[in-house]
Amino acid sequence: MVAQEQQKPFVIGLDLGGTNSVFGIVDQRGNILTTNSIKTQAYKTAEDFVSAGVEALKPIIAKVGGIEQIKAMGIGAPNGNYYRGTIEFAPNVPWGHDGVIPLADMFSEKLGIPVGLTNDANAAAIGEMQYGVARGMKNFIMITLGTGVGSGIVVDGHMVYGSDGFAGELGHTIIR
């Protein structure tokens, strides 16, 4: 089973934004092979969003040889909780204020592959640490600005998630 898993050369990435959500298939070197997108704001429920996302994934998965070529999926999302694989009370996603949404499990059920989820700024920091300008850096902060504002904090080469999974959520900071 392990040898079979290692032969799967691609992963799916989802950058879930408050306005648009972009799906991509990436190889082991971080090269984006193909993408598709949907309007995040077009869906009233998480279930509708996941169904539309799976439909958007079908043609790009087919381009790389089918789901059997996909090892896993990673999601970067506002208010994403790495520990739980959930989006929690996300005000900048139409269906996000419904409470705690088990988005990783929802996609995993539909696709039949493992799915991980983290805060979108943390995902950006991890990407920069592995493939971008933060390669080799042990300590840095990645600031993101889109529909919301966030940060991914890296200390001693490790992502800081905090005790509850929400370290770096700058958009929820009260400044007086």
Model-derived features with residue positions:
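Glycine/GP-enriched mid-protein hinge/lid loop-to-helix segment characteristic of carbohydrate kinases
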Residues: 2, 8, 26, 34-37, ...
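Short glycine-rich anion-binding loops that position phosphate/pyrophosphate groups of nucleotides
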Residues: 78-81, 146-148
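Glycine-rich phosphate-binding loop and adjoining helix at the ATP-binding site
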Residues: 46-54, 69-73, 79-139
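Conserved catalytic-loop position in the HRD/HxD motif
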Residues: 15
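N-terminal phosphate-binding loop and adjacent alpha-helix
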Residues: 32-69, 99
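Conserved Rossmann-like nucleotide-cofactor binding loop
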Residues: 19, 31
